[in-house]
UniProtKB/Swiss-Prot annotation:
Pfam families: bPH_8. Belongs to the UPF0457 family. This is UPF0457 protein BCE33L2265.
Length: 86
């Protein structure tokens, strides 16, 4: 598994990358946007998932407890998974 894998269930968002798996309850998600900063530097406390270098796109997931920056070259696929209706 080289890239980030995102799955959405009725209650949570599951993000897998390498050996890590992060589960985010959907009720905690505030906003999902494209992050235009380089390496997500504006969100210094955000959890960074993926390889920051060699990727062209960043997706910012803001939640009640923690923010996440996903580094990817497959932005469309990840956003489609996040925005999918269940």
């Amino acid at each position: 598994m080289l890239g980030i894998d995102v799955k959405k269930t009725k209650e949570e968002l599951i993000i897998s990358w390498q050996l890590a798996e992060i589960t985010i309850p959907l009720r905690d998600v505030i906003e999902v946007t494209e992050d235009a900063t380089y390496a997500g530097v504006e969100e210094t406390s955000a959890i960074r998932i993926g390889t920051a270098y060699g990727t062209t796109d960043r997706i910012l997931i803001k939640t009640v407890k923690q923010n996440y920056v996903l580094f990817t070259t497959n932005k469309v696929s990840i956003l489609n998974a996040i925005n999918a209706k269940n």
